């Protein structure tokens, strides 16, 4: 995969430096501009799906004074708008229909802003599916790339002679945007799957609760009906007895 290409490139050119690995060390942490892509749903009725991811986003954004917000999903847009939080970009129709085309639009936007040094760090906050029953909000760092994430496991055993043409820099210029597109597409698909799973679980719970409520209401209705019938019979018998006594 692309990750293996990066690993091999760093293995054979350990002194290699590139703009996508720029940690912005010249800036103080409090002065850095941090970008957040927050992935929510377009609709509700999905249990705590939207609440959990928005809660994590707020917690992370509160840690920095300079933030840039990118929102995927109508729920996130409405939520931050109500709180008067500036939304720098919205990606419409993406939450319900994740495609490579839409992933490319997001990747190109944040990559360009990082290249131009408007953004110093970029994260995506979404819902990660653990299994069919469990999911949790997750924050994934996109930029800058970390060298240790691409360390080659066979650094001392790989003796191949590798040449990158036209240059290692040009290779990275081409590979990283494609890598980001694939990474973001994977995030969108996983978030969409988590949303559908959360909605199915919520609807299943609602159906169960509704069935139990109907059962309880039916029981109460039958009790009330039985009590009314008993009351009527009692009144009829009492009336008949009263007439007998009078006669």
Q: What are the residue ranges of the model-derived segments?
A:
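C-terminal beta-strand-loop-alpha-helix "lid" module of Rossmann-like NAD(P)-dependent dehydrogenases
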Residues: 1-247
């Amino acid at each position: 995969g692309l990750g293996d290409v990066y690993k091999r490139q760093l293995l054979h050119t350990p002194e290699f430096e590139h703009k996508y690995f720029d940690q912005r060390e010249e800036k103080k942490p409090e002065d850095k501009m941090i970008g957040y892509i927050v992935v929510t749903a377009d609709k509700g009725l999905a249990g705590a799906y939207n609440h959990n991811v928005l809660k994590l986003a707020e917690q992370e954004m509160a840690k920095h004074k300079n933030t840039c917000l990118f929102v995927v999903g109508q729920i996130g847009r409405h939520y931050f708008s109500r709180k008067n939080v500036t939304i720098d970009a919205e990606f419409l129709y993406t939450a319900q229909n994740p495609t490579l085309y839409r992933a490319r639009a997001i990747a190109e936007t944040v990559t360009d802003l990082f290249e131009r040094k408007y953004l110093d760090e970029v994260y995506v906050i979404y819902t990660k599916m653990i299994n069919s029953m469990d999911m949790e909000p997750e924050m994934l760092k996109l930029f800058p790339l970390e060298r240790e994430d691409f360390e080659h496991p066979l650094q001392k055993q790989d003796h191949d002679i590798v040449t990158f043409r036209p240059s290692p820099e040009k290779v990275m210029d081409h590979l990283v945007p494609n890598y980001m597109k694939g990474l973001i597409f994977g995030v969108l698909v996983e978030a969409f799957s988590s949303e559908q799973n959360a909605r199915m679980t919520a609807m299943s719970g609602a159906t169960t609760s509704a069935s139990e409520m109907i059962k309880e209401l039916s029981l109460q209705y039958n009790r009330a009906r039985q009590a009314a019938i008993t009351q009527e019979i009692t009144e009829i018998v009492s009336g008949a007895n009263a007439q007998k006594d009078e006669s």
